[in-house]
């Protein structure tokens, strides 16, 4: 292990004594594969003298890991603060194929390559999805504790200082270009002690600390609606595990969630069974039981090896940026409705934000300001806002009742729907449609919704 003592720079200081060093793993040889950033030579902000720009990334999930790596590669003195190095988040763990390539992820951190999905309606009608996938295409299934640790390690290899600590609060700058003072509790993983209070001064902060973000609270970023996700990891027999070898299941219905879905996703040697809800959080365990019952025959005899719960944001925060502080990932609210996807968008937003800082600071040589970080938000909104709006509409239309969910599952049987859905999901690009097929899809959608509404009216009559 290599012991690295943080240096004291003019205008910035760390309150801990010089001999209170931070221990990091030795960096491995690193192959630089990231694309070059275009640096504007007309920057008018002051140069940073005698040191490089200092940035703290709070939170070590996909957003924080991707941000810290990009910053460190770009010449920024980077500090990544993560409170729990083995954190297991209740996350389905699905990642799109494009993320594997964009973030150079090794295949050995992917537990399963899902090529088949079953969408199961409230009446247990199952539709097989994945017929249009090409031989090389798949949805990757990962464990968050594995993915997150890998991205943090890569950030450390790029030069970031990874600190095991709990972020407490942040003192705002007292003058233009003055530092932010971060207060955190530093932990020693060897002693498992109560921790030591420390401070760190930095020029900018990236808040990647999740749905309960303390960085967001520090800049009064505002609240948002959130879902509660509940997940159990269940160890099942080898013969039952073969069924889920490359298959994931999604269950819809009022029994598993009034506004989301239940899932069974395969991991390395177990399955993750979970559900979520925004409107009925107190009933989450009831919905989880219903999800298990729906999948009962396929997971019977399984042993629960871990139980996890966590909030999931439902829309972006009212404020995602203030001065030299920006929010990314769940802290910013970047989780899609309808699907609940967040891993890719977290990592992508972390990278985008870091790129804006690297570019604005001219590889760490100049101070950044809010206009530099705002470029990240402008690029993000232009690229992904339409995706969020479309999925928001889909959730409102198809998740509002059991008849609507039946119509949704019926639509999923259409190969054109599957192709458009998978192409958009796997590559995060709006797939070009066929005008004739689009017209057929519109007619079929209307027909499905008409049948769903007729069914709902009949069910309402029977309930009177």
UniProtKB/Swiss-Prot annotation:
Keywords: Chlorophyll biosynthesis, Chloroplast, NADP, Oxidoreductase, Photosynthesis, Plastid, Transit peptide. Pathway: Porphyrin-containing compound metabolism; chlorophyll biosynthesis; Cofactor biosynthesis; tocopherol biosynthesis. It catalyses: phytyl diphosphate + 3 NADP(+) = geranylgeranyl diphosphate + 3 NADPH + 3 H(+). Residues 1-54 form a transit peptide. It is found in: Plastid, Chloroplast. GO terms for molecular function: FAD binding; geranylgeranyl diphosphate reductase activity; geranylgeranyl reductase activity. It comes from the Eukaryota. Coiled coil: none annotated. GO terms for biological process: chlorophyll biosynthetic process; geranylgeranyl diphosphate metabolic process; photosynthesis; phytyl diphosphate biosynthetic process; vitamin E biosynthetic process. Its main location: plastid. It is an enzyme of class 1 (oxidoreductase). Its EC number is 1.3.1.83. GO terms for cellular component: chloroplast. Catalyzes the reduction of geranylgeranyl diphosphate to phytyl diphosphate, providing phytol for both tocopherol and chlorophyll synthesis. NCBIfam families: BchP-ChlP, ChlP, GG-red-SF. Belongs to the geranylgeranyl reductase family. ChlP subfamily. This is Geranylgeranyl diphosphate reductase, chloroplastic.
């Amino acid at each position: 292990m290599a012991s690295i003592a943080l240096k004291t720079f003019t205008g910035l200081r760390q309150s801990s004594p010089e001999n209170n060093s931070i221990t990091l793993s030795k960096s491995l040889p690193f192959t630089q594969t990231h694309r070059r950033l275009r640096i504007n030579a007309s920057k008018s902000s002051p140069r940073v003298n005698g040191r490089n720009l200092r940035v703290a990334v709070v939170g070590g999930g996909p957003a924080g890991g991707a941000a810290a790596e990009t910053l460190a590669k770009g010449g920024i003195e980077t500090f990544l603060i993560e409170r729990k190095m083995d954190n297991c988040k209740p996350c389905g763990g699905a990642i799109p194929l494009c993320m594997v390539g964009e973030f150079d992820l090794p295949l050995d951190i992917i537990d399963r390559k899902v090529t088949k999905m079953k969408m199961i309606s409230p009446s247990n009608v199952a539709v097989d999805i994945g017929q249009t996938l090409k031989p090389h295409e798949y949805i990757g299934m990962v464990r968050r504790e594995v993915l997150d640790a890998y991205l943090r390690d890569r950030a450390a290899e790029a030069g970031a200082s990874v600190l095991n600590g709990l972020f407490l609060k942040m003192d705002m700058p007292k003058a233009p270009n003055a530092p932010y003072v971060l207060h955190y509790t530093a932990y020693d993983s060897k002693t498992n002690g109560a921790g030591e209070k420390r401070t760190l001064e930095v020029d900018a902060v990236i808040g990647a600390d999740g749905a309960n973000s303390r960085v967001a609270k520090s800049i009064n970023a505002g609240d948002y609606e959130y879902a509660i996700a509940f997940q159990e990891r269940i160890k099942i027999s080898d013969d039952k595990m073969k069924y889920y070898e490359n298959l994931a299941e999604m269950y819809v219905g009022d029994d598993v969630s009034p506004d989301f879905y239940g899932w069974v996703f395969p991991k390395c040697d177990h399955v993750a069974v979970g559900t979520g809800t925004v409107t009925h959080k107190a009933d989450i365990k009831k919905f989880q039981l219903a999800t298990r019952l729906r999948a009962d025959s396929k997971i019977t005899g399984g042993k629960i090896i871990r139980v996890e719960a966590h909030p999931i944001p439902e829309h972006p925060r009212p404020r995602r940026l203030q001065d030299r502080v920006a929010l990314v990932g769940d802290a910013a609210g970047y989780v899609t409705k309808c699907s609940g996807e967040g891993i890719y968008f977290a990592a992508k937003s972390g990278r985008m934000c870091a790129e804006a800082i690297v570019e604005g600071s001219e590889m760490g040589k100049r101070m950044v300001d809010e206009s530099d970080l705002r470029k990240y938000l402008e690029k993000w909104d232009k690229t992904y806002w339409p995706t969020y709006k479309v999925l928001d509409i889909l959730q409102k239309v198809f998740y509002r009742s059991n008849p609507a969910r039946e119509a949704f599952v019926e639509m999923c049987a259409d190969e054109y729907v599957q192709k458009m859905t998978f192409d958009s999901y796997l590559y995060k690009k709006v797939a070009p449609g066929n005008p004739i097929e689009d017209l057929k899809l519109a007619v079929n959608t209307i027909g499905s919704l008409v049948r769903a509404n007729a069914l709902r009216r009949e069910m309402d009559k029977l309930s009177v």
